[in-house]
């Protein structure tokens, strides 16, 4: 016969076991709920990724990125720091603008005058390179680039060789020498960079001149207007079109000619998605790092 103390002990053990079992059941329920919550969260992740990655899987393997005037979010446009930033950030191409000084030197600068970049009204074609080289073109960036100068094309070619491809836009005006295009093509050839460069311009005659000098040198016709007969532009290997001209029909027609479509200027996810869906081959952007990361 069990003693009263033993009965009490047995009851306590039973109660303890019951409590442990109850706790374990509660824990399992909480774990199940937590696991279910985790599954729900994980199941939502692809939706978030797809919502952000509007360009589609693997789009960077199909589309090249061109840094417009270098990476001009990191340094002043069309300067060596901007070109170096584009290389360091992994852009495929740099787009830059070439023009000519009073003494015939090929320099990298977009505008006809210095007003926007320096506050000075002087025209590029009225100044020698020696005069231009004394001017800081990054004064509006504060002290960060206090010694930044207008680079020569030769300087840029030397730095970029075997590092990155160049989309060299010809800025045409009435003050350039007659051998302007010949100097440009000759310098590219002398540096052994013909396969690394593409000459582009709004001026189709400049592209014709390029092809006469070097038929193998790649060219691109820039346009902000619809091109009704792209097949007529035989001296253009590619077409550089403003973003509003990009659509599947236009891109398909140009592709049927064996030519590529380069879109400008593409600075947001919507524009990237538009170009990708249309089949554009190359995107010129002011924000290369952001476009590549998104």
Describe the role of every protein-language-model region.
Residues 4, 28-294:
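Phosphate-group recognition and catalysis centered on beta-loop-alpha active-site segments
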Residues 1-26:
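N-terminal secretory signal peptides that target proteins for export/translocation
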């Amino acid at each position: 016969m069990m003693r009263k103390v033993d009965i009490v002990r047995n009851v306590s053990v039973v109660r303890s076991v019951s409590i442990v079992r109850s706790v374990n059941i509660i824990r399992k329920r909480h774990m199940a709920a937590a696991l279910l919550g985790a599954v729900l969260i994980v199941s939502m992740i692809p939706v978030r990724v797809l919502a952000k990655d509007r360009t589609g899987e693997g789009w960077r393997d199909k589309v090249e990125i061109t840094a417009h005037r270098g990476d001009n979010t990191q340094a002043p446009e069309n300067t060596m720091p901007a070109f170096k930033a584009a290389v360091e950030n992994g852009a495929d191409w740099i787009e830059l603008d070439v023009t000519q000084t009073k003494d015939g030197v090929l320099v990298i600068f977009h505008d006809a005058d210095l007003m926007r970049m320096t506050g000075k009204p002087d025209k590029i074609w009225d100044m020698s390179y020696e005069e231009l080289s004394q001017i800081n073109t990054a004064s509006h960036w504060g002290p960060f680039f206090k010694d930044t100068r207008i680079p020569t094309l030769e300087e840029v070619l030397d730095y970029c060789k075997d590092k990155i491809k160049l989309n060299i836009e010809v800025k045409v005006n009435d003050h350039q020498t007659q051998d302007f295009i010949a100097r440009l093509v000759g310098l590219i050839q002398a540096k052994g960079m013909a396969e690394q460069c593409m000459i582009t311009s709004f001026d189709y005659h400049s592209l014709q001149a390029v092809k006469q000098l070097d038929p193998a040198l790649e060219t691109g016709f820039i346009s902000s207007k619809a091109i009704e007969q792209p097949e007529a532009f035989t001296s253009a290997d590619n077409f550089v079109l403003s973003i509003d001209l990009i659509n599947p029909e236009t891109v398909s027609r140009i592709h049927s000619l064996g030519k590529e479509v380069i879109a400008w200027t593409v600075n947001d996810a919507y524009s990237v998605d538009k170009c990708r869906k249309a089949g554009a081959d190359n995107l010129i952007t002011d924000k290369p790092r952001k476009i590549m990361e998104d």
